[in-house]
C-alpha cells in the first residue's frame, strides 16, 4: 500500500515538473500584450486639490479633514486624540473591573 502511494506521489511530481517546464509559446510565436487603455489620458487630480497652490500656499488644515468620502474613524493612527480617548476608556474599564472583586 505504501509503495502505491509513493509511486502515485512520484508520478504527480513528474507531471508537475513536465507542466512547469513546458514552453508558454510555440517556436516563433510572439506574446500578445493588453492595450494600455487610457495611458495617454491625463491624471485627474483630487477634487479638493488646487493647482494654484504651491507648497508654501498649502492649507495645513486640509490634513485634518477626511479624504474624499472616507469615514472619519477609518485611520485612527492619524488622530492622536482618538488613541488618548481609547486608552482612557481601557483604563476606566480595567479599574472598574478591579473594584468589583
UniProtKB/Swiss-Prot annotation:
Q: Name one Pfam family in it.
A: Anophelin
Question: Which stretch is the leader sequence?
Answer: 1-21
Q: In terms of domain of life, where is this protein from? A: Eukaryota
Compositionally biased region (Polar residues): 88-101
Q: Which GO terms describe its cellular component?
A: extracellular region
Q: What keywords tag this UniProt record?
A: Blood coagulation cascade inhibiting toxin, Glycoprotein, Hemostasis impairing toxin, Secreted, Signal, Toxin
Q: Assign the protein's first listed, main location to one coarse class.
A: secreted
- Glycoprotein in keyword set: yes
Give a GO molecular function annotation for the protein: toxin activity
- Write out the annotated subcellular location: Secreted
Region listing for Blocks active site cleft of host thrombin in a reverse direction compared to substrates, in residue ranges: 75-78
- What ranges does the record list as Acidic residues composition bias? 31-40
Claim: Cell membrane is one of the keywords in the record = no
Function description: Salivary protein with anticoagulant activity that inhibits host thrombin (F2).
User: Per the similarity annotation, which family is this?
Assistant: Belongs to the anophelin family.
Give the record's subunit note.
Interacts with human F2 (thrombin); the interaction results in thrombin inhibition.
The name this protein carries in UniProt is: Salivary thrombin inhibitor anophelin
What species was this sequence derived from? Anopheles stephensi (Indo-Pakistan malaria mosquito)
